């Protein structure tokens, strides 16, 4: 009983016996779903046809369990999908839509930012000329995820001082601006003009819920659209100085300060933070050695900006949340060594490492590392 495309196995049963059949199914299969809710139930004048969700080798089992109590037939019919049916997996949504040769290209994960899904195809060589396959996979993502309205494909690595990547529209609405909800905060952003990754959700929650004291002065040196700053100020009565070089990120940062009900305050700056100290300007003079805590979420090159951090942090000590990409193996140990060497060159020392961890594997050769360290100026004790 081999199935053709768009066919399924159905139980054909007399209408007057349909209710008894349903009861027997529930009794004999209490923990299994054997009726397929993807397809419409069919009926004619005398019979009802129930679509089955079991493999051919289980049909005899069904006959043995229910057949003695009830007369029915197993037949093949063209299956019509229910209009309100919601696919649970991409594989299910793509069944019969793409060749099985491309099943290995269906992504196991993808980012969802607001109403936009962002997908990356691992085997780009195989997919380069397969626009139709990409489009079908993208449409399947929209089918599986209720809130997704658009799908974009990553077309480059994150690059440049603004940390942006090229994207290509695959399916759904065209538009790169969205509202993203995270940890009781709302972030307005543009996926092409600003940097944002939902994969640091847990890390941002950890930092925002850490032991931050009332009245702290905090510098967020690479604030982006405010993902760290807003979440911290949402929970704590603090003053945050949030810097970003990208004018679009700065625009959205200001909007996100307004749309979130904050306990603390955030002062945004659109500036290259190197310009705080080369030469010193009014902002740096105001903040020099007055900052209690510094966030350095720029893993590609954060160590190069530790001169700015050491210039701002209190000489008697403060906390730096430093993020870096570090080579495997022993990536944490190597990251700490690089961090220590760099701050010592500015006459600071590590008094305590409060946390050091692998945030994620960034590539086959490197990890993304976080170091939460209390540092102070030499000769303070």
Protein language model annotation of sequence segments:
Residues 1-381:
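SAM-dependent transferase fold signal centered on methyltransferase-like domains
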